[in-house]
């Protein structure tokens, strides 16, 4: 960030816990907790947090019910209805929670949030116009929209957590 790099993506695998979920998650959750804490602290101390957006999420949550069948041994399958994500810095207020699930985390109860809402909010706060055209990575001579019209039409905003 200090060198003007506009975008960094980090892929940290090992979260697909269909088997032995709680045992499997001990290591990556501890590592992620320490890494995100250090990143946010460092960005804040260097005066970069206000101009840097940090987004941490997966593409879905995990089913509320733990599968105790022998072949899964405490696993949890994919679950798109409820999930957790984190955004920080770059125009987002800290310490906020948006949305709420029911008591069993089987359905949303208040203010459903979608991945498209995160995308729309991040693009807006980063000053990216979704109608701009960027080189298509498959055919570098052709240009395509930053966001397809189908995705753009579904993008809400998380304005309740904007600074």
Where on the chain are the PLM-derived regions?
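Ligand-binding pockets and gating/stacking loops
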Residues: 1-163
């Amino acid at each position: 960030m200090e060198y003007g790099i506009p975008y960094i993506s980090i892929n940290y695998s090992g979260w697909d816990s269909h088997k032995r979920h709680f045992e499997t998650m001990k290591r990556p959750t501890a590592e992620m907790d320490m890494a995100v804490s250090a990143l946010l602290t460092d960005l804040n101390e260097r005066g970069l947090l206000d101009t840097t957006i940090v987004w941490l999420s997966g593409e879905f949550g995990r089913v509320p019910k733990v599968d105790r069948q022998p072949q899964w041994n405490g696993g949890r399958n994919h679950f798109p209805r409820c999930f957790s994500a984190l955004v920080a810095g770059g125009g987002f207020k800290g310490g906020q929670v948006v949305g709420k699930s029911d008591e069993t985390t089987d359905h949303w109860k208040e203010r459903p949030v979608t991945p498209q809402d995160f995308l729309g909010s991040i693009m807006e706060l980063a000053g990216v116009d979704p109608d701009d055209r960027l080189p298509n990575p498959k055919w570098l001579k052709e240009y395509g929209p930053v966001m397809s019209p189908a995705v753009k039409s579904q993008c809400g905003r998380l304005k309740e957590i904007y600074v």
